[in-house]
């Protein structure tokens, strides 16, 4: 009786380890064989695509440093990492830097060796880091939308536009965050988020509750008013808020997954997906084999006529 259960790595789209002398299909033993995480259906030149990712990462990094300095100057530096908004923003920065560097590395190899040259995360990095990259990607294209929706539905208001500083903060952290996530979803060839990462993202959201209540016990305030179980906060509605956010994440995750599926189909239809050198080499090998057989046949026929 065969065991058809897939490992956690396999569910993330990461192939199992293969021995050096083991014969198997190239794609089946390679992470991201079609280089989807480092290519775009819109920006065909990977240098441009990688550069745009780095620019986004630099903007997020600069704004993060400036906002953190403001927290520190107001004596609130120790609470900066207590906010889910800030944690998500830092996650965006980390992802765009990581993906940007990988894309630039791919572009350099692409220039030397062609489109199927690969990139470091794909070819030489351990499966553990490949898995973390997939999980980080799953949070990057879902959590910013949760942050933006919750903020403008429950927390934001006219007061955020009272000063230039607060307006810039609101735009950068609560609007552009979702815009960057949407761009990553629509303008890249990254595959649909694996379903196995849905419970992982729910677990991360649940874990944040621990951060929020540890912050209350150690610093004496609730990071978000709806997490306050007292009558001054959300009161009896607290479970509804928590469950609602979890359900919202499930719905959002599903929507994001199928948007990526649709984008992949459109990219394939309009031939916006790179044809890998590996495939070209296979075709050339088949062509040479057929050519060799034809030459041998002609030689036999020529010998027979002689």
Where are these regions (language model features)?
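Alpha-helical transmembrane segments of multipass membrane proteins
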Residues: 204-215, 248-256
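Transmembrane-helix exit/juxtamembrane "anchor" motif
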Residues: 100-109, 251-275
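Membrane-lumen (extracellular) interface motif
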Residues: 63-87, 151-170, 185-199, 214-236
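Membrane-interface transmembrane-helix boundary segments in multi-pass integral membrane proteins
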Residues: 44-48, 219-257, 276-281
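Transmembrane alpha-helices of multi-pass eukaryotic membrane proteins
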Residues: 45-60, 78-99, 128-144, 163-177, ...
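Non-transmembrane, juxtamembrane loop and terminal tail segments
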Residues: 1-39, 112-123, 269-306
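Helical transmembrane-bundle signal
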Residues: 56-67, 92-99, 141-151, 181-184, ...
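First transmembrane helix
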Residues: 21-36, 49-71, 92-100
């Amino acid at each position: 009786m065969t065991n058809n259960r897939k490992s956690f790595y396999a569910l993330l789209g990461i192939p199992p380890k293969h021995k050096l002398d083991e014969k198997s299909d190239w794609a089946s033993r390679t992470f991201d064989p079609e280089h989807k995480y480092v290519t775009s259906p819109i920006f065909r030149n990977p240098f441009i695509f990688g550069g745009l990712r780095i620019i986004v990462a630099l903007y997020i990094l600069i704004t993060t440093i400036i906002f953190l300095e403001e927290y520190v100057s107001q004596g609130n530096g120790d609470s900066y990492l207590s906010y889910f908004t800030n944690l998500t923003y830092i996650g965006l920065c980390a992802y765009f830097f990581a993906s940007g560097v990988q894309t630039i590395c791919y572009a350099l190899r692409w220039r030397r060796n062609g489109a199927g040259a690969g990139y470091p995360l794909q070819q030489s990095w351990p499966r553990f880091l490949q898995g973390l990259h997939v999980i980080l990607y799953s949070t990057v294209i879902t959590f910013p939308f949760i942050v933006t929706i919750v903020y403008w539905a429950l927390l934001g208001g006219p007061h955020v536009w009272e000063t230039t500083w607060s307006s810039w903060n609101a735009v950068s952290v609560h609007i552009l965050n979702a815009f960057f996530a949407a761009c990553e979803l629509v303008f890249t060839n990254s595959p649909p988020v694996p379903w196995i990462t849905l419970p992982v993202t729910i677990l991360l959201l649940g874990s944040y509750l621990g951060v929020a209540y540890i912050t209350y016990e150690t610093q004496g305030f609730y990071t978000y008013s709806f997490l306050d179980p007292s009558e001054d906060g959300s009161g009896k509605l607290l479970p509804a808020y928590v469950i609602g956010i979890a359900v919202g994440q499930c719905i959002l995750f599903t929507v994001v997954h199928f948007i990526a599926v649709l984008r992949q189909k459109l990219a394939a239809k309009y031939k916006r997906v790179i044809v890998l050198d590996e495939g070209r080499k296979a075709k050339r090998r088949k062509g040479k084999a057929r050519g060799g057989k034809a030459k041998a046949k002609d030689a036999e026929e020529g010998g027979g006529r002689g």
